[in-house]
């Protein structure tokens, strides 16, 4: 019985640790990813095909290419926070 209580206590402690907020260091979001923008040097035009991405700047972009254009124009390190709308 004591082992079972110990396992339950350990599981609850693990849940508390997992549920804690992840600190954001140096202004960087913990789950963002870098867009692939290398092709923008050769051809700075984007298709209008909709594949929404949410930028770390809080804006929704039509696609990853549009986010790359915004990175170039604003000279900001905009990354992809998630696929879809912000």
Swiss-Prot record:
One of its GO terms (biological process) is response to xenobiotic stimulus. GO terms for molecular function: serine-type endopeptidase inhibitor activity. Keywords: Disulfide bond, Protease inhibitor, Secreted, Serine protease inhibitor, Signal. The keyword Zinc does not apply. It is found in: Secreted. PROSITE patterns: KAZAL_1, KAZAL_2. The keyword Ribonucleoprotein does not apply. InterPro entries: Kazal_dom, Kazal_dom_sf, Spink4-like. GO terms for cellular component: extracellular region. Residues 1-26 form the signal peptide. Residues 31-86 form the Kazal-like domain. The record marks 48-49 as: Reactive bond. Disulfide bonds join 37-68, 46-65, 54-86. This is Serine protease inhibitor Kazal-type 4. It comes from Homo sapiens (Human). The lineage of its organism: Eukaryota, Metazoa, Chordata, Craniata, Vertebrata. The gene is SPINK4.
